[in-house]
Amino acid sequence: MLRVKGLRVEVEGHEVLHDISLHLPVGEVHALLGPNGSGKTTFIMAIMGFERYKVTRGRILFKGEDVTHLPLYERARRGMGLAFQRPPVVRGVKTRQLVEMCARVEDVDVDAIARELHCEGFLDRDVNLGFSGGEMKRSELVQL
């Protein structure tokens, strides 16, 4: 599903990742571990297409398609997503509002997805405000 080949990444003109390769087949779960400052976040942000993280060499393939030079929103449309370790609280924005905004790209039933992930009880609360760790993760899954 995800293959990274010989990736080199620069941040603000400095090469921070050199010749990184990875293969994550469908149905497998992997963990990316390393000490602080080893490039884990840089690697993930580059894979997702955040502009600050410039891929200078290598390829990123998602479901067999080369997405290396696609913008973040196009990668998201193809099904790529990211869950944060500590997602931000967004006061004044209900989880339902955020999910419905994301759902406009595709025709999806927000309530059906919320039921499937057992999170319909917090759709009308501010995003991540007072959420338990598990609620935050389920909220992120609904948003993806």
Task: Annotate each language-model stretch with its function.
Residues 2-4, 16-17:
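Conserved structural motif at the start of ABC-family nucleotide-binding domains
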